[in-house]
Amino acid sequence: MPSLEDYRIPYPAAGPCQKRTVIYLPQQDSAVEQHHLRVQLIPGRHVRCEDGCFYQLTGTVSEETLQSWGYPYYVVTLDDIYPAQCSPSDPANPRTFVPLRESPMIPYNSKRPIVVYVPEDAEVRYRVWCSDVLQVQESQQELEAPAVSQSCPVPVRERQNNPEGHAHPVVVHSVESPEVSGHKDGDQPMKKSSKLKQSCSNSSRSLKHSASGSSPKNTPLFSRESVPPEHSLSAAQQRRRSNENSAIDETGGGASRKKRSDSTSSRKDDQDSGYEKKVKNLWNRARGNSSPKRSASPKKSGRDSRRNS
């Protein structure tokens, strides 16, 4: 803490029945000190007021200037005490410091101390006042200041009551997701990997059924239905679906066999029709060749009969 000798300012010594009080102010920005800060001097005296009423002192605070230096200092005189409020303000805590009625406001200057001369039984208190503009600027700076990064929470062990009689009453509260670690005693946590495996097996089964029922000659059947993990099929539904797929395969196989039989019958019909055509042609040729012989034979027989006659 600095002393008055550090400033090398020759302030006068305290007079009889007086004492010198020095106030050192913290350094601020020069513009802020000049325009936004003020110091209120509150001289007073210690008097115990048992009734709890609010009292004040009469007196004066005069400003004087140090010769050949131009620095101000203040001289306080205290007179009588009088009650400023008749009703007790705080009977349980009676006042012990009675302030002066007039408390002057002086400029804020941290470059030099504030020197006040008061009576020996008096005391000087002070209060620093700031304008609303400075308060707004400070609030804006607090809002614009970067937020302090919060550290990761550490798991905390808490011992809880165990009314159900489980073997492990200690519960560890961690930062994990509730789907993995949030479960009660005796319950198993959710396992997403098993559901994914089950859905993959279901989709592979449906693809196998469709591949077995298809052939190069028939139209392949593919299952485009995807089973989500949270709605997996039960065993009965899987058996029913496999039966339906097998029935579809059987009907598809019967249709293919029917088509093959139809194609073979059509081929046979074509072969039969060709054979019949050949037989008819031969028959027609045979009839054509035999008809003149039949017509010639009776003529020949007639000629022979005539000759014989």
Curated annotation (Swiss-Prot):
Biased segments, Polar residues type: 209-221
Bias (Low complexity) ranges: 168-180, 196-205, 290-299
Pfam families, alphabetized: Ecotin
InterPro entries, sorted: Ecotin_C (IPR027438), Ecotin_sf (IPR036198), Prot_inh_ecotin (IPR005658)
Segment forming the signal sequence: none
UniProt feature, compositional bias: Basic and acidic residues: 156-167, 181-190, 261-279
Region span, Disordered: 140-309
Gene Ontology molecular function, alphabetical: serine-type endopeptidase inhibitor activity
Family: Belongs to the protease inhibitor I11 (ecotin) family.
Name under which the protein is recorded: Ecotin-like protein 3
